Amino acid sequence: MPELTHFDAAGQAHMVDVGGKQETRRIAIARGSIRMLPETFALIRDGNAKKGDVIGIARIAAIQGSKRTADLIPLCHPLALTRVKVDFELDDTLPGVHCTVQVETLGRTGVEMEALTAVQVGLLTVYDMCKAVDRGMTITDVRVLEKHGGKSGDWVAG
């Protein structure tokens, strides 16, 4: 079983030293969903939410979230991201919204945390903008779908 890299031999938390690693192209794709009442879904779909363009604002929030990951997750390295692509898919069968984020960098450590943070912040923004009409919304199934680059190579969720 692989070791936990954020702890030293004495069990103390530390930021991993990535100084000796090769810079490679790193890509991570994460996805999550938010379930809601059909009426809430209709407000988003039809562009009638009182706070404005829910998906447009959530997209900007997701991008901002990816860029602020190191400020939120204590042992994450601050990274110079080269690309953040955010897609929202309206799904009337949930009913709800799926958020998929692809994050890229040229660096020494992966961008999985940035992709996960972006998804969460995007979905939290949907919740924030619609909570006045639906406090029962549920954020669910947030996970990494793919990771590419680095020493460990490619990984795709099964």
UniProtKB/Swiss-Prot annotation:
* CDD domains, sorted: MoaC_PE
What catalytic reaction does the record list?
(8S)-3',8-cyclo-7,8-dihydroguanosine 5'-triphosphate = cyclic pyranopterin phosphate + diphosphate
* Residues noted as binding substrate in the record, renumbered to the chain: L75, C76, H77, M113, E114
Top-level EC class as recorded in UniProt: lyase
What is annotated as the active site?
A: D128
Claim: Iron is one of the keywords in the record? no
One MF term in GO for this entry? cyclic pyranopterin monophosphate synthase activity
Work out whether the entry's keyword set contains Lipid metabolism: no
Keywords, sorted A to Z: Lyase, Molybdenum cofactor biosynthesis
Per the record, the GO terms for biological process are:
Mo-molybdopterin cofactor biosynthetic process
Q: How does it assemble?
A: Homohexamer; trimer of dimers.
Q: Which NCBIfam families match?
A: moaC, PRK09364.1
Q: Which family does it belong to?
A: Belongs to the MoaC family.
Purpose of the protein: Catalyzes the conversion of (8S)-3',8-cyclo-7,8-dihydroguanosine 5'-triphosphate to cyclic pyranopterin monophosphate (cPMP).
Write down what this protein is called.
Cyclic pyranopterin monophosphate synthase
Q: What species was this sequence derived from? A: Paraburkholderia phytofirmans (strain DSM 17436 / LMG 22146 / PsJN)
